[in-house]
């Protein structure tokens, strides 16, 4: 029975991946931060829950003790979203965005690579179309995904001598609890802004909120993301990148043939409300 480590497995895409792989006969070592989530994961067949905060360096360094000597794959799924105009970003929030979405993912890979080498295993990173496209208000999140894309590319080439594939999953908006609560999160972010920034960016904040509502309606099926992860783990020749929805592909196709000045104007208009 193959074994896989899935981080951020307690909800959303991570939980869907965990359920799918356990049903397919994988031994899933699934991480979650809270004791309650660990307990819930423990009720699933073939799932071995591990309580872990991926930003806890000592805990991540000790992660191999909770895993089998031979590990067939790791799916780096843990992540958060920090929203807001760059001018108003709290630097601590920006640091946490990069820590959770970038540094901690690399820390996990560094910790388990010896076990992956024994199995000639695979590395999968949960990236995003936001690692290829940046919209106003998404600078921090996009920065984390752009960084992850670059690090994954470097890692893929560096691991070639051991034939360890590295794949990036690049979904767009997906129907999960994270996206379901996106408007509430956005409103909390807006409430935390200073009055001056709220006034300066009023049109942008209102426009971005409308866009979020539209994107929630267009959010894709999480099954498509789960199937992309499955292919990355089981295909004889896994792809370097898996794009999961038509909306994201259309956006990328638009960017490929559009001058930056025009795409900037289009994206700025899409995230600005005139009333």
Regions found by a protein language model. Give the residues of each.
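Conserved glycine-rich cofactor-binding loop
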Residues: 10-11
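The beta1-alpha1 cofactor-binding region of Rossmann-like NAD(H)/NADP(H)-dependent oxidoreductases
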Residues: 52-62, 91
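Substrate-binding pocket helix/loop in short-chain dehydrogenase/reductase
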Residues: 85-86, 93-95
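Active-site helix of classical SDR
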Residues: 109, 144-147
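Residue(s) in the substrate-gating loop at a strand-loop-helix junction
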Residues: 128
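C-terminal beta-strand-loop-alpha-helix "lid" module of Rossmann-like NAD(P)-dependent dehydrogenases
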Residues: 161-213
